[in-house]
Amino acid sequence: MVVRRFAEACGRGDVTALTAVLGVEVVGTCDSGGLVPGPDEPLHGQAEVARLVTTLCRRAGVDLAVESVNGRAGLVLRRGSRAVAVIGAETAGYEIATLWIVLNPAKLGDWHRS
């Protein structure tokens, strides 16, 4: 499963493995709602997308979980019981073609654990 390899690479902080699972023309789009730091424009290419994802996953105290995101496999990043990011993925073959990254705290409430 592509998303599981993506999650494992993120969890290890392995930029080489992370880049290998991203398609050459991968696009990453963030929704920060202007409430938290995040890129305003879509990111294009393995290097830009890998840099953002690596930054998110390296935050202190963040745990990763592979979960269903909009009916597809994705990642939920939590600090304790609170979701800090949800990453939806669209795959093409054995690579990730598109990532949708929700950082907007107003949209993460349903992902918190009680």
Q: Predicted segments — roles?
A:
Residues 1-114:
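C-terminal and inter-domain tail/linker signature
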